[in-house]
């Protein structure tokens, strides 16, 4: 990420897409760009007198883990992911915030850190704050995985849906696991961009084309994250 300790503050928001850094910046004052190297774009700004670092991590657990490790190295204490998810239950609409109370580690990266039995859970403190700030969000267990376009996506999603999981992404499991190992408080706040049983490509198209519900959901997830860090 090419940041120095002098660039850091204790609170950070990570996003996948470098373009989403601009969306977070709309909520900040006195922000300034820091670095842009590979998928890692960063800026620092102020939200209600609280300084926040914003960093993009690209797609997937490996690059997210690099970002988390390097944020830890420069002194960051709290990291909230603001990202996208696909729902795993009917009735979760586009733009609904999904907040993970834990994650199934269905990725390869975290298995390099800890045994499969090791749980991936967020900070109970940050989670409790989120429940106060956003009681309307959908809370539950999510799944973090490594691939979008698997031949057995439908069967895999149905399998995990039957266990009550609410959504899936690619980075939250890594955030919870690496964050826990490094003593960082973490939380993942996700904007639902694919309804359960909907075609993945249709959901991606909604995100890219700017579906109103998806846009409003993105704004709401950013707002929740900033309010949690400010509380």
Predicted features along the sequence, with ranges:
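Metabolite-binding pocket within alpha/beta catalytic cores that recognizes anionic/polar moieties
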Residues: 1-128
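Flexible, glycine/charged-enriched surface loops at secondary-structure junctions
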Residues: 31-36, 136-141, 231
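Short acidic/glycine-rich loop or secondary-structure boundary segments that cap or lie
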Residues: 88-90, 106-108, 148-153, 197-198
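Short, hinge-like loop/turn segments at secondary-structure boundaries
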Residues: 96-100, 186, 205-207
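Active-site rim beta-loop-alpha module in soluble metabolic enzymes
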Residues: 119-167
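Generic non-transmembrane alpha-helical segments
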Residues: 129-136, 178, 224-231
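A C-terminal functional module that forms or caps the active site or interfaces directly
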Residues: 154-160, 166-197
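His/Asp/Glu-rich mid-to-C-terminal helical/loop segments that flank catalytic regions of hydrolases
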Residues: 198-231
């Amino acid at each position: 990420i090419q940041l120095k300790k002098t660039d850091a503050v204790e609170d950070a928001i990570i996003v996948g897409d470098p373009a989403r850094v601009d969306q977070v910046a709309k909520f900040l004052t006195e922000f300034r760009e820091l670095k842009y190297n590979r998928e890692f774009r960063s800026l620092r700004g102020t939200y209600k007198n609280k300084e926040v670092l914003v960093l993009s991590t690209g797609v997937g657990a490996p690059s997210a883990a690099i970002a988390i490790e390097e944020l830890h190295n420069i002194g960051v204490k709290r990291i909230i992911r603001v990202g996208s998810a696909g729902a795993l239950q009917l009735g979760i609409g586009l733009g609904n915030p999904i907040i993970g109370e834990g994650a199934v580690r269905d990725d390869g990266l975290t298995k390099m850190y800890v045994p499969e039995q090791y749980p991936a859970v967020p900070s109970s403190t940050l989670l409790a704050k989120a429940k106060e700030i956003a009681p309307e969000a959908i809370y539950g267990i999510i799944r973090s995985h490594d691939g979008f376009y698997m031949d057995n996506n439908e069967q895999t999603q149905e399998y995990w849906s039957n266990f009550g999981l609410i959504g899936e992404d690619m980075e939250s499991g890594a955030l919870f696991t690496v964050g826990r190992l490094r003593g960082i408080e973490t939380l993942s706040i996700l904007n639902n961009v694919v309804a359960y049983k909907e075609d993945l490509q249709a959901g991606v198209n909604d995100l890219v084309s700017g579906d109103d519900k998806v846009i409003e959901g993105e704004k709401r997830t950013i707002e929740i994250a900033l309010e949690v860090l400010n509380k």
